[in-house]
A protein has these predicted regions:
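Conserved SAM-binding motif I beta-strand of class I
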Residues: 2-3
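Glycine-rich beta-alpha junction loops
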Residues: 6-7, 37, 61-62, 85-86, ...
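Glycine-rich cofactor phosphate-binding loops and adjacent beta1-alpha1 units
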Residues: 7-78
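Residue-level detector of short coil/turn "hinge" positions at structural boundaries
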Residues: 19-21, 79, 103-104, 130
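Phenylalanine-focused residue identity feature
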Residues: 28-29, 38, 79, 90, ...
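A general structural-boundary detector
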Residues: 32, 59, 80, 103-106, ...
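C-terminal hydrophobic helical "lid"/dimerization subdomain
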Residues: 43, 87, 91-139
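Rossmann-fold dehydrogenase core element
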Residues: 54, 67-106
Length: 139
């Protein structure tokens, strides 16, 4: 289950990626992955992990806020930060993109470098579907 508050991205995920994407969940999960790393996503992860469960944090959106330290401590939740890959992993992933093995990449929006601030603001405000914007000086 992917929790996605942005209705534009949620529709894209459900229609094109064959996953279950919802705005919010009521149940608890033994493993929660925060791939975004904003205060709000850490709040959701902290609230929805089962007692004794694990939060795996890979998102680097913001550096503070969102963790309910009291709940994590009392309910013995493990918090694991992970952000590593080898040069070989990077090369394999790049080759998979170039070979088209990751499917269509129409979810990546391309914009001129000069629109960088606007693009990041629109991502945070949920105004665009794309979670990634490729900025290029030649776009």
């Amino acid at each position: 289950i992917i929790v996605e508050p942005n209705s534009i991205r949620r529709k894209y995920l459900n229609d094109k990626c064959h996953v279950i994407s919802v705005e919010k969940v009521d149940q608890f999960f033994s493993i929660v992955v925060d791939a975004v790393g904003f205060k709000k996503t850490r709040e959701i992860a902290s609230a929805k992990v089962s007692p004794g469960g694990v939060i795996t944090h890979i998102g680097l959106g913001e550096d503070t806020g969102g963790i309910d330290v009291r709940r994590i401590t009392l309910q013995e939740v493990s918090f694991i930060g992970t952000y590593t890959y080898t040069a070989g992993d990077f090369m394999d992933t790049a080759q998979a993109i170039f070979d088209g093995r990751l499917g269509p990449l129409d979810w990546i929006e391309r914009r001129p470098l000069s629109e960088g601030n606007t693009a990041f603001r629109e991502i945070r405000e949920g105004k665009i579907a794309s979670p990634k914007v490729l900025l290029s000086p030649n776009c």
